Each structure stands twice: as structure tokens, then as C-alpha cells.
């Protein structure tokens, strides 16, 4: 009887030891793998942009013996271990070891998290916005206060896929508009990519903005930090009140700056969509940063482009025609990113996709059917979007050219351009006829009467200034104007910008126009919405190569 008792005790000890061993090595993986995956199904690496999913999937399973597990720091020499390229100066020093391998709390309100390699703490606090289909948790990496930890299941993701993302981050992320890569950790089950934390994605931001615009309060999530930011920022113009370089356009300019940096380094992103643009919030200032370099391609060596890959790149509804048509004779190059940016810009400006609903986008892109382009009313935006969505890749502007477009000029630059255009036109009488005959009807309308658009109060003030007071000489900026002449309208804008303290000294006029330059820009843009692009095209045709306009075109 006593022999049976000893045997049962021994068996119980073995069971307890096995259970403890399992809990230490495997149990915590549930923190970053909450939903059990079907091993027989095609593995999901990530979700795509606004609605679709990535067409490119990876199916190779990693060797379970590989990695840098907490209990297996000495790995098999034959196992593949992901690494940061040694020639990249990303982490000059290895992150400091955490004090203990035991579980720690991310903060007082959180349950214990998982420690990886004594350097990374992965909390159980999953990030609410900007995950793009991945499992992303808040974490602490070494002494860094906070990182976003992108968790990739090694059973469903190849080492090559992850290594490509790491290599591209190391090559390209030294820029204010590319999400920063802080490091890589790995255990037997997961690879952990440590990234700069963010507030939300551009997709989250636009959808929340659209809901607020439509006052669909029932669909809005409970108030959080993101909504607090949204309430204080006007992302789009109010009806009838144009806001040049609105916060949303500033975010779009951030994206172009990031693309220009990638293209300068001969890297194609290949998957630009609203979910892959992340928003950083600091002191109520928003910055857009490009993320997800997993499908990016570096054009190394002497090659400037590469043929279409065997599997389609990018996300459904957010691919260029050359990416969708699978024409091996055509090359996927930087213009593909610019087409994607054109779709992104339309989505940011209007809250809609230029090629329609999710189910019809790919077909419309293939057939060049821009169903929603007519919804755009801003002429600067229409002009740029049409160029970016050109079916022929060679006719799309580059990222550096897009940065020079008037859509991304601030009020001061817009007014300075009109002033220099006015000075140049005044010097060349041969330009007057073409300006008033061809351009004026599109700017002023058939009546060619710009005085009526400015209002009686404003015009009366201008006319009073033109009449010299007794004993005073009439100054040049007080000369009378011909209200049918577009050249004289440009002269008026030029004079107000150069002498606004004298011309806008009347309190009523100052209140009407607002501050210079923002208020003055809005005042004239609201009344003559075609003015900027028409004069821009006119000067581009006649004076583009002149030194005075070099900063606007080159």
C-alpha cells in the first residue's frame, strides 16, 4: 500500500514539473496570440489598406528550434535567427537588460506582461488604432519609455518576409516622416518588431472626421485622446471658406516628404494606403509617417527598376494599373507609389476613394474609370490628383515635383507668387492680351467684373484711397483700377500684400480681410477660386525658366 502511495506522489511531482515548465515557456504566448489560428489555412501576414487584404501571403513555417527564447539563449547553429543588419547604425548600444525574467506590470492598471530576452517587455495592452491587421501591443524596450511592439507569429511568417521589413526600416527610417524602428527581438514563437509608438492611422483619422462631419454620433467610439485632438482641429475647409494648407493637407505633405526620402534611397514602398500612414501627436501637433515596409523593395546596384513580381504587391483597391494588370513587359517603379498617393490624396481631401466602392475599385483602376473624381471642387487638388492618377506611369509627377505643387503652398508663398507674377506681367505688354482674352473669363466669369465679387464696401475703400488728399500726391499703390482687367486684379493683390498696413487701416476692411497673409489669401481665394491655378499655368507657360520663378517650379 505504501509503495502505491509513493508512486502516486512521484507521478504528481512529475505532472507539476511538466505543468510549470509549460507555463513558463508557452503559456504567455497567449498574451500576443489571443485567437487560436487554424494551422491548415493560408497564413495571414497582415491586412491591407482601408478595406482590402494583402494579396501577397507567406506560407513557409519557421523552425521551432530557432530564435532567442528565454530558456534557450544558445540556439542551434543551423537555425535561422533574424537580425538587424550590422552595417546599419540603428542601435549603437544594445538595449539595457531588464532586471528580471519574472513577469512585470506595464503599469499599475495592467495585468502582467511578457518579458522577451530580458530586454523587451510586451504588455497586454493592445493598441486600439493603426494596427493594420497585425497584433500590436504597447511595450517597453530597454530604457525607452514606450514602444509599439508588432508581433509576428513565426509559424505563419517566413524569416525572409520579416528580414525584408527590418532591412528596409534600417535603410530608410532616418527621416521625420518614416516610422522609426527601434529594434528586433525573437523567441521560439514570435518575432517582435519594436517601433515608434503612434496615436492612430490616417484611415482612423479620416473615418472619425467623416463621422463627425456627418454628425453620426452613434457610430463614434467613446471619447478618448484621439477625439479630444479631433475636436480642436479643423481638418477640412468649411463650406464657402477655403482654408489653404489645412491640417489634412499638411499631413499629405508629410507623406510626400516620406516618399521623396524613400525614392531618393531607391526604395519603392509598394503598399501605400491609409492604414499604412500612421499619425504621431505631440503637443496638439499632428505628423504623418509612412509605415509597414514589409513589401518595400530596394532597387540596389545599377538597376533603376524591376519587373513585376510573381505575386501581386500592395492592397486591394490601392494598387496602380501596372501592379494589377500583371504585364511582365511593364516595370513596377516609383510611379506606382505616386499613383497610390493620388488615391490617398483624394481619400484625404474628400473622404472617398477616386475609383468608387471597395468591390469595384480594382476593376475601375484597370479600366481607368475615375468614378468619384468629379466630387473634388478644389482646383489645386483636382489638378494634382489628375496628374497622379494618370494611367501612363511615365506621365505621373515624382514626389519632389509634387512637393512644388501649389496645393502644398502656404498662404505666404501663394501670395508672393501672385505678387511676382503681377510684377512680371506688368513688364511685358505682349502678355496682357493673352491674359485678359484667355485667362480672365475662367477667373472672373463672362462678365469680367471682379469689383462685384469684392463687394461695395471694399471697392469704395479702394476708390477713396485712389483719390489723393489735398496737398498730397497719389501714391502708386493708390492708383485707380479697371474692374474688367485681370491684370489690375493681380496688381490690387500685389499692392495690398506690399502695403497692407496702409491699405487695410480701416477697421471694417481689416475685419473683412483678416490677418495677412492667411486672411488675405482666404479672402481672394474664396472669391476667385480659379485664380491660383490659372496664373500658375500661365506663368509656367511663359516664364517657367526665369530665375525669379525658379523656386516655384524647380
UniProtKB/Swiss-Prot annotation:
Binding site for ATP: 150
Signal peptide boundaries: 1-17
GO terms of biological process kind: endoplasmic reticulum unfolded protein response; mRNA processing
Keyword Nucleotide-binding: yes
Listed Basic and acidic residues bias regions: 51-63
Domain KEN: 411-554
Keywords: ATP-binding, Nucleotide-binding, Signal
GO molecular function, one term: RNA endonuclease activity
Pfam families recorded: Pkinase, Ribonuc_2-5A
GO cellular component, one term: endoplasmic reticulum
Region span, Disordered: 36-85
Gene3D superfamilies per record: KEN domain, Phosphorylase Kinase, domain 1, Transferase(Phosphotransferase) domain 1
Domain Protein kinase: 121-408
Keyword match Hydrolase: no
Disulfide bond sites: none
Entry-linked InterPro entries: IRE1/2-like, KEN_dom, KEN_sf, Kinase-like_dom_sf, Prot_kinase_dom
Entry-linked PANTHER family: IRE1-RELATED, NON-SPECIFIC SERINE_THREONINE PROTEIN KINASE
Family the entry assigns: Belongs to the protein kinase superfamily. Ser/Thr protein kinase family.
Domain notes: The protein kinase domain is predicted to be catalytically inactive. As the kinase activity is required for activation of the endoribonuclease domain, the protein could be inactive.
Protein name (record): Inactive serine/threonine-protein kinase/endoribonuclease IRE1-like
Amino acid at each position: 500500500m505504501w509503495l502505491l502511495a509513493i508512486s502516486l506522489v512521484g507521478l504528481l511531482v512529475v505532472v507539476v514539473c511538466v505543468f510549470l515548465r509549460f507555463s513558463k515557456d508557452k503559456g504567455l504566448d497567449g498574451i500576443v496570440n489571443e485567437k487560436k489560428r487554424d494551422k491548415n489555412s493560408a497564413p495571414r501576414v497582415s491586412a491591407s489598406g482601408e478595406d482590402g487584404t494583402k494579396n501577397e501571403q507567406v506560407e513557409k513555417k519557421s523552425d521551432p528550434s530557432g530564435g532567442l527564447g528565454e530558456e534557450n539563449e544558445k540556439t542551434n547553429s543551423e537555425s535561422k535567427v533574424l537580425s538587424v543588419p550590422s552595417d546599419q547604425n540603428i542601435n549603437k548600444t544594445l538595449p539595457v537588460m531588464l532586471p528580471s525574467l519574472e513577469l512585470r506590470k506595464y503599469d499599475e492598471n495592467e495585468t502582467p506582461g511578457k518579458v522577451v530576452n530580458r530586454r523587451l517587455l510586451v504588455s497586454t495592452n493592445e493598441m486600439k488604432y493603426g494596427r493594420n491587421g497585425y497584433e500590436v501591443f504597447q511595450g517597453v524596450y530597454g530604457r525607452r519609455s514606450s514602444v509599439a511592439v508588432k508581433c509576428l507569429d513565426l509559424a505563419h511568417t517566413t524569416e525572409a518576409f520579416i528580414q525584408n521589413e527590418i532591412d528596409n526600416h534600417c535603410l530608410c527610417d532616418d527621416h521625420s516622416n518614416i516610422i522609426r524602428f527601434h529594434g528586433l527581438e525573437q523567441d521560439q514563437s514570435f518575432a517582435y518588431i519594436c517601433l515608434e509608438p503612434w496615436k492612430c492611422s490616417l484611415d482612423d483619422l479620416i473615418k472619425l472626421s467623416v463621422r463627425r462631419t456627418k454628425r453620426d454620433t452613434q457610430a463614434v467610439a467613446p471619447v478618448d485622446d484621439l477625439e479630444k485632438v479631433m475636436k480642436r482641429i479643423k481638418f477640412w475647409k468649411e463650406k464657402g471658406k477655403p482654408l489653404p494648407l489645412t491640417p489634412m493637407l499638411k499631413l499629405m505633405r508629410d507623406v510626400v516628404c516620406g516618399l521623396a526620402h524613400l525614392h531618393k534611397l531607391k526604395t519603392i514602398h509598394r503598399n501605400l494606403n491609409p492604414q499604412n500612414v500612421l499619425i504621431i501627436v505631440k503637443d496638439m501637433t499632428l505628423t504623418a509617417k509612412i509605415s509597414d515596409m514589409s513589401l518595400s523593395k530596394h532597387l540596389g546596384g545599377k538597376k533603376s527598376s524591376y519587373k513585376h513580381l510573381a505575386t501581386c504587391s500592395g492592397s486591394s483597391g490601392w494598387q496602380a494599373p501596372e501592379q494589377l494588370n500583371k504585364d511582365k513587359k511593364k516595370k513596377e517603379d516609383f510611379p506606382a507609389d505616386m499613383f497610390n498617393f493620388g488615391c490617398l490624396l483624394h481619400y484625404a481631401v474628400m473622404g472617398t476613394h477616386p475609383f468608387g466602392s471597395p468591390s469595384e475599385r480594382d476593376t475601375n483602376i484597370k479600366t481607368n474609370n475615375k468614378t468619384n473624381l468629379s466630387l473634388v471642387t478644389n482646383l489645386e487638388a483636382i489638378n494634382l490628383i489628375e496628374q497622379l492618377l494618370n494611367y501612363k506611369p511615365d506621365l505621373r509627377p515624382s514626389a519632389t515635383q509634387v512637393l512644388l505643387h501649389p496645393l502644398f503652398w502656404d498662404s505666404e508663398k501663394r501670395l508672393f507668387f501672385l505678387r511676382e507674377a503681377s510684377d512680371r506681367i506688368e513688364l511685358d505688354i505682349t502678355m496682357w492680351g493673352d491674359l485678359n482674352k484667355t485667362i480672365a473669363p475662367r477667373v472672373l466669369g463672362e462678365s469680367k467684373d471682379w469689383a462685384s465679387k469684392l463687394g461695395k464696401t471694399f471697392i469704395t475703400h479702394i476708390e477713396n484711397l485712389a483719390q489723393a488728399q489735398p496737398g498730397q500726391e497719389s501714391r502708386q499703390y493708390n492708383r485707380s483700377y479697371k474692374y474688367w482687367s485681370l491684370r489690375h486684379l493681380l496688381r490690387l493683390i500685389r499692392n495690398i500684400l506690399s502695403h497692407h498696413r496702409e491699405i487695410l487701416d480701416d477697421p471694417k476692411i481689416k475685419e473683412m480681410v483678416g490677418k495677412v497673409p492667411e486672411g488675405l489669401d482666404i479672402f481672394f481665394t474664396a472669391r476667385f477660386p480659379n485664380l491660383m491655378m490659372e496664373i500658375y499655368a500661365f506663368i509656367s507657360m511663359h516664364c517657367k525658366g526665369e530665375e525669379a520663378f525658379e523656386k516655384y517650379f524647380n
